A protein has these predicted regions:
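Non-catalytic interface/targeting segments
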Residues: 1-46, 105-118
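Short acidic loop-to-helix transition motifs that present clustered carboxylates
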Residues: 93-98
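Alpha-helix C-cap/termination motif
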Residues: 54-55, 106
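Short, charged beta->alpha transition segments
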Residues: 44-53, 99-100
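Mid-chain, well-packed structural core segment of small domains
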Residues: 55-91
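Short active-site-adjacent helix-start/loop capping segments
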Residues: 34, 69-73, 99
Length: 118
C-alpha cells in the first residue's frame, strides 16, 4: 500500500493516517521511524544503507533537510546514489513532503528520508 504524507509541521509528520515525531524514511509500502544519522545534520552513506540496498531499488530519493534546511549531504552520498542510478532531490522538509507525494502518485519508485526538526 502506498504511504502518502498527509501533513507535516516542525517535529511531526502524518503518513498514511499515522503520526510520527521522529525522523523517518518512507518507502512506498512502509515507514521506518526513529531514523538516526551518524553525524546529526550531516547525511552520510551509512545513514542511507536501507535505501541503497532496497529491492526494488528506488528511482528517486527525496531528502527533507529539515524545517530550516540545516541537514547537509556528504559528497559520498551523491556519488553512491548516482552510481546506483537513483535521482536525488534535496529540499526543506515541507517542500520535500509535497515532492514525495507528487512523485509517488506519478507511479515512480520513490523513497523519502525526512528530518522533521531544524
Amino acid at each position: 500500500m502506498r504511504k502518502l504524507i498527509n501533513s507535516y509541521r516542525f517535529g511531526a509528520i502524518e503518513i498514511g493516517g499515522k503520526r510520527y515525531t521522529t525522523d523517518v524514511v518512507i518507502f512506498p509500502d512502509r515507514v521506518l521511524d526513529g531514523w538516526w544519522r551518524k553525524e546529526g545534520h550531516r547525511l552520510c552513506v551509512e545513514d542511507l544503507s536501507k535505501v541503497l540496498n532496497a529491492d526494488p531499488r528506488p528511482e528517486v530519493l527525496v531528502v527533507g533537510t529539515g524545517y530550516s534546511g540545516l541537514v547537509k549531504l556528504s559528497g559520498e552520498v551523491e556519488e553512491a546514489l548516482k552510481d546506483r542510478g537513483i535521482r536525488l532531490i534535496t529540499q526543506p522538509t515541507k517542500e520535500a513532503c509535497q515532492t514525495f507525494n507528487r512523485i509517488l502518485e506519478s507511479g515512480q519508485r520513490v523513497v523519502a528520508a525526512l528530518h522533521l526538526t531544524c
